[in-house]
């Protein structure tokens, strides 16, 4: 199907900042936004291990062409229908980011379509806003690589608080390695299921300073408790997962509530892979309701890294005139959320 009315645009989005390769197609018209396809292929490493950049990049290279063809087929479009190709510029892991950037660049040249480099964090936020309908929330962005409390002001997503060391998702993933928990479908998901069966709340440090937090010491403490358990201590892996979750999520709720009070917001939007966790959503919901507010979150199709969020955020930028030239179509491991000028919002 060919769209000739240029008040309507179609974007192909390519995401590959970590172990998920995602490709999605989105349509923007003056009256609606429509997801045409949203496909993903995940690199899963063996239990007790993480994913190495070189292996993850090889996975993305191996599956990109197939996934792109399937995304176009599901969307029922051809390359001629695509107005722009959006890709994750950063932040993320260097090798997988670069593998997808090179592939997006190749499509741009093959199809003669402009490129739009997208900030991964902004992609999460804009997709969350679209799916949930949250108007102007405080955003808790929590994933394997990022932990930030964000609010919008003067055409920037301002970071009010963040982790001072590792991300909360990285803390959970690395603890899954300690317990040799399966990485399929995701270590954080498997920790969540074990935590539901835990009953003992063990003593784990709580590290919050203002709207910032720290997780590296908490991980070290949890690792030490795991060693005690293996030596015969009277608690289970389920108790450890329960205690770790309760502690780190309480920290996230505290810094989010502080940001809500600071900016006068009654809405919370949780985005990022950790945002799928039902216990985090439950705890955040209790806090928000006590303040007369509400919490918004998406399901795993949109909170876990995906191509459609890159297509959506990229197309929002494209419609304001933004383009990424071939010479500037690089990627970067460090790309702050507040570096992006949000021209499409008032």
UniProtKB/Swiss-Prot annotation:
Q: Where does a divalent metal cation bind?
A: 120, 124, 141, 305
Catalyses: L-threonylcarbamoyladenylate + adenosine(37) in tRNA = N(6)-L-threonylcarbamoyladenosine(37) in tRNA + AMP + H(+)
Q: Gene3D superfamilies attached here? A: 3.30.420.40
Matching entries from PANTHER family are given as: TRNA N6-ADENOSINE THREONYLCARBAMOYLTRANSFERASE
Q: Which cysteines are joined by disulfide bonds?
A: none
Q: Which organism is it from?
A: Gibberella zeae (strain ATCC MYA-4620 / CBS 123657 / FGSC 9075 / NRRL 31084 / PH-1)
Where does the source fall among the domains of life? Eukaryota
CDD domains xref list: ASKHA_NBD_OSGEP_like_euk
Q: Which InterPro entries match?
A: ATPase_NBD, Gcp-like_dom, KAE1/TsaD, Kae1_archaea_euk, Peptidase_M22_CS
Annotated protein name in UniProt = tRNA N6-adenosine threonylcarbamoyltransferase
Alphabetical list of Pfam families matching this protein: TsaD
Its top-level enzyme class, in one word, is: transferase
* Cofactor note text: Binds 1 divalent metal cation per subunit.
**Which is one Gene Ontology cellular component term of this protein?**
nucleus
């Amino acid at each position: 199907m060919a769209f000739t009315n240029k008040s309507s645009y179609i974007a192909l989005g390519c995401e590959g900042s970590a172990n998920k390769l995602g490709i999605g197609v989105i349509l923007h018209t003056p009256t609606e936004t429509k997801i045409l396809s949203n496909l993903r292929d995940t690199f899963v490493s063996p239990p007790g291990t993480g994913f190495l950049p070189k292996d993850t990049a090889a996975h993305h290279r191996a599956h990109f062409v197939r996934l792109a063809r399937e995304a176009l087929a599901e969307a029922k479009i051809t390359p001629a229908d695509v107005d722009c190709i959006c890709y994750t510029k950063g932040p993320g892991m260097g090798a997988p980011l670069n593998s997808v950037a090179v592939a997006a660049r190749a499509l741009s040249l093959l199809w003669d379509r402009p490129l739009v480099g997208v900030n991964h964090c902004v992609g999460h936020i804009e997709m969350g806003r679209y799916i949930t309908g949250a108007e102007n929330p405080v955003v808790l962005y929590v994933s394997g690589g990022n932990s930030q409390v964000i609010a919008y002001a003067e055409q920037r997503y301002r970071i009010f608080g963040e982790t001072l060391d590792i991300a909360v998702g990285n803390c959970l993933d690395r603890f899954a390695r300690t317990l040799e928990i399966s990485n399929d479908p995701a270590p954080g998901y498997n920790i969540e299921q074990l935590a539901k069966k835990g009953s003992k709340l063990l003593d784990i440090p709580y590290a919050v300073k203002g709207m910032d937090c720290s997780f590296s010491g908490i991980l070290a403490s949890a690792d030490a408790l795991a060693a005690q358990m293996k030596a015969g201590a009277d608690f289970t892996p389920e108790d450890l997962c329960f205690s770790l979750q309760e502690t780190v999520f309480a920290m996230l709720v505290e810094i989010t509530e502080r940001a809500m009070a600071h900016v006068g917001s009654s809405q919370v939007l949780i985005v990022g892979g950790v945002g799928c966790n039902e216990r985090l959503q439950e705890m955040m919901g209790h806090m928000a309701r006590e303040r007369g507010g509400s919490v918004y979150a998406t399901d795993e199709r949109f909170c876990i890294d995906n191509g459609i969020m890159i297509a959506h955020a990229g197309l929002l930028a494209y419609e304001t005139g933004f383009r990424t030239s071939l010479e500037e179509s690089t990627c970067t491991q460090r790309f702050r959320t507040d570096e992006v000028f949000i021209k499409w919002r008032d």
